[in-house]
A protein has these predicted regions:
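Bacterial N-terminal signal peptides that target proteins for export
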Residues: 1-8
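Sec/Tat signal peptide C-region and signal peptidase I cleavage site
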Residues: 13-22
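Exported/periplasmic ABC-transporter solute-binding proteins
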Residues: 22-273
């Protein structure tokens, strides 16, 4: 290399290192439902400016709120509203809530069950499956196969919302559950890998030809029904900060809820505000 080329390369790398060191880091953690959205938003946001760099990890809604309350994350991702006990535990500062999109919990079954004719379910039927009172698909006019019910782990916002809206309480026992999945992606893998499973997922995970999305209480889980509230298992997705956001955290939040960020949401299978 010529001396001039070498000097230019040194200057270039010095500039890159300087930019990297100067960028304020924003850590986002929590809900696995929100995770793919936040990752896509962060990738676009990070590529548009150099002052703030956002990193995203999962862990579940409860873990994200804990991380924010303990000062380990600037932003918590949540698929449910913060609870009174969480507010009380970290009462030194007030949590700030930011709506970032709509979502619906979709009831999904293995493709062979769907293809055999199980295409809808009622709240009562679903509750009885997870309570262990309905145990075979033939009881729902399906094939003679045991029902393999999948639930989310403790601390999951999706689990809490499902238990509250379907089972009647977030703390309810669900003896019909055969396995507990650590995250939305794991639920989808378990359902698609079985010929007799049922589970619940956020809307963005429930698309695809490798599983069957059930009509719930006579209502299809689509964008229109989720946004207008007619789909019974509709909800909002949130960002939370513990106290006032840092400048870069606020900048990222503003991007996500702004027109560019909402476009990213729609392009990645989420339901914009």
């Amino acid at each position: 290399l010529s001396k001039l080329t070498t000097m230019l390369l040194i200057a270039l790398f010095a500039g890159l290192i300087g930019t990297s060191l100067a960028a304020e880091k924003v850590t986002v953690s929590g809900s696995t439902t929100v995770l793919p959205l936040a990752e896509a938003e962060a990738e676009t946001f990070n590529g548009q400016q150099a002052d703030c760099q956002v990193t995203v990890t999962g862990g579940g809604t409860g873990a994200g709120i804990t991380a924010a309350g303990e000062g380990r994350s600037e932003i918590a991702m949540a698929s449910r509203e913060i609870t009174a006990s969480e507010k009380s535990k970290y009462s030194k500062n007030a949590f700030q809530q930011f709506d970032i999109g709509y979502d619906g919990i979709v009831i999904v079954v293995s493709k062979p069950i769907y293809d055999a004719g199980v295409k809808s379910i009622t709240k009562d039927q679903l509750k009885k499956i997870y309570a262990g009172e309905i145990t075979n698909w033939k009881e729902l006019n399906g094939p003679d196969k045991d029902i393999y019910a999948i639930a989310r782990e403790d601390g999951s916002g999706t689990r809490d919302t499902f238990n509250e809206l379907v089972m009647g309480s977030t703390a309810v026992e669900t003896p019909g559950v055969k396995t507990v999945a650590q995250g939305s992606a794991e639920v989808k893998t378990a359902v698609t890998g079985s010929d007799k499973a049922i589970g619940y997922l956020g809307y963005s995970y429930a698309n695809g030809s490798d599983l069957g999305a059930l009509t719930y209480e006579g209502v299809v889980a689509n964008v229109e029904n989720i946004k207008n509230g007619s789909y019974p298992l509709h909800r909002h997705l949130y960002f939370y900060t513990w106290g006032q956001p840092t400048a870069c955290a606020q900048k990222f939040i503003d991007f996500v809820i702004g027109s560019d960020g909402q476009k990213v949401a729609g392009e990645n299978g989420f339901i914009p505000l």
